[in-house]
Amino acid sequence: MNLINNANKKLFEKINNLKNYSCQVKFSDAIEIEINDFDDNIIDLAKDLKPWRKGPFKLNATLIDSEWQSFIKFNGLKPFLNLKDKIVADVGCNNGYYMFKMLELEPKSIVGFDPSVLSFLQFSFINHFVKSNIKFELLGVQDLPNYNIKFDTILCLGVLYHRSDPIKTLKELKSSLNKGGEVFIDTMFIQRDDEFVLSPKSTYSKIPNIYFIPSIKALRNWCERAKFKTFDILSIKNTDFNEQRKTQWIYGESLENFLDPNDPKLTIEGYPAPKRVYVRLS
């Protein structure tokens, strides 16, 4: 596997050289891992793997306090997830937090897709202790149609606005489903009643790779063009400082730095602040 640079190779070697610890795992809001014969080298390695965007994870008494309180999103989706004996994909899976949480729902298999090497390293580190059969592919959503299996359920959370051709992305998700399958997406949207799409000039919330933020009507149109037959809105919520915030486990800025300090209803660029819609497609 090409891990791109020597620093990543060294981290991968450190993960592979970890002892085969005996562990107990609890899937609460944090993925809690109680490690027998725990030593400080484990925490040193976790710190070397910063920034931790998704989580949290707890290794004995040490909380990896991720930027995102990802259990908020998962707990909102969980009542709609019927995963028992299903073949599941998590597209844009980051470090696998949602995949680990889905284990308790007894899917047949889980495959994560994310081209980020750091995400793969974090996943490999956590999975060394969890010892799951989750598979992580260093691939993106564009690789799904040519993947060797189809899926009953696909999660694609926080990805669509990072794609320069969102309709193509939705088509790729649709083509990767088994018959009767479903896709769960969450995406930022603009609160308007018409068929409107915001295309930021250069950045949105200081993020350069956000291309299109639709109104819900425009999002529905995209999904219909991708040949989805059903469009079920599960929830709508604002992103707030409880869900996304700066911690000692990340570098740089977080949501509080991305919004207008004089008006938190606006981004630093003057666009409407992030709102998210959660949708089930089939």
Swiss-Prot record:
Pfam families: Methyltransf_9 (PF08003). Transmembrane segments: none annotated. Homotetramer. InterPro entries: CmoB, Mo5U34_MeTrfas-like, SAM-dependent_MTases_sf. Carboxy-S-adenosyl-L-methionine binds at residues 54, 68, 73, 92, 114-116, 161, 276. CDD domains: AdoMet_MTases. The gene is cmoB. GO terms for molecular function: transferase activity, transferring alkyl or aryl (other than methyl) groups. It catalyses: carboxy-S-adenosyl-L-methionine + 5-hydroxyuridine(34) in tRNA = 5-carboxymethoxyuridine(34) in tRNA + S-adenosyl-L-homocysteine + H(+). One of its GO terms (biological process) is tRNA wobble uridine modification. Its EC number is 2.5.1.-. Keywords: Transferase, tRNA processing. This is tRNA U34 carboxymethyltransferase. The lineage of its organism: Bacteria, Pseudomonadati, Campylobacterota, Epsilonproteobacteria, Campylobacterales. Belongs to the class I-like SAM-binding methyltransferase superfamily. CmoB family. Catalyzes carboxymethyl transfer from carboxy-S-adenosyl-L-methionine (Cx-SAM) to 5-hydroxyuridine (ho5U) to form 5-carboxymethoxyuridine (cmo5U) at position 34 in tRNAs. It comes from Campylobacter fetus subsp. fetus (strain 82-40).
